[in-house]
Amino acid sequence: MADDFNLSCPIPLFEHATVQMAHGGGGRLMRELIEGMFLPAFQSAEPGAAGKQSPPHDSAVVELDGARLAFTTDTFVVSPLFFPGGDIGRLAVFGTTNDLAMAGAKPLWLSAAFILEEGLPMETLRRVVASMRQAAEEVGVRIVTGDTKVVDRGKGDGIFINTAGVGSIPPGVQISPARVVPGDAVILSGDLGRHGIAVMSVREGLQFEGAPESDCASLSGLVEALVDAGSDLHCLRDLTRGGLAAALNEIAGHAGVGIELDEAPIPVAEPVAGACELLGLDPLYVANEGRLVAIVPAEAAERTLQIMRSQPVAAEAAIIGAVTDVRPGTVELRSQLGGRRIVDLLSGEQLPRIC
């Protein structure tokens, strides 16, 4: 595997010779980095595994002594550390446990690793740690191990946090992009763009009328309700970096299907829509921290929608589109005026360091 990864080629593998902010933005450059460097280096080399890799998902699924576990990790570098509706501590817990939930898993354990900058006020650290504890109690997950490093003053930005999580997947639950097929319905759990706009508003000192709070929230209870109700969930994806657009492009690409969206039922709060219009942003690409998209069989869509709407975090859930066999790997939006446009991956970085 190492020899294959280091093959000499006269054509550069990457467009940029150095890491760019957009390599962490959830768009095209991030996908190229993952698929061009990390996956070839780290994918399983077990005998017989070649050509049989599962599509990438928010969590790895590991079988151990008959049990199926979900395992994931995430790193949080949000700036500022505190923002309307949340903080880096809540993000560090909810972000990782939400990734576990996207595999249908009940979160069990977390690790927490801190990179602290010299000079950080202890009161700031105390607030972040207290927030993490409260968030963990809300989810019902235990923080069981961790690590701490301190870097020189000016070599960090206050606090960076990494969390890794393990969760248990109930028997019979199979959630993966590989299960997505033409005819499936696409359901969005709530309005878009709150988190990205909330963070950017504070960071840039922007003031909007009715400025939104982040949607930072746990999705574990919502997924547990769907699983307990026996919902046939083909795929789940939380809408973090790159927003709804990035999530659906990933699913369409990995499943080899097309996805057609209707603009009209996609909920966007008025303050978010106004801020996006003013700043030239598309809400489809703005990050969320408490929203998911569910892809289910068409015949199960209405029942799934009602279950979702019974949960406070998904009260505004809506069916927003369908999976097709037209233009595999492509996401297309039908506008309220009847026009159509391709919803592609971003090539640059819209809102850096929002999680």
What function would you assign to each model-found segment?
Residues M1-C355:
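Helix-biased detector of long, well-ordered alpha-helical tracts
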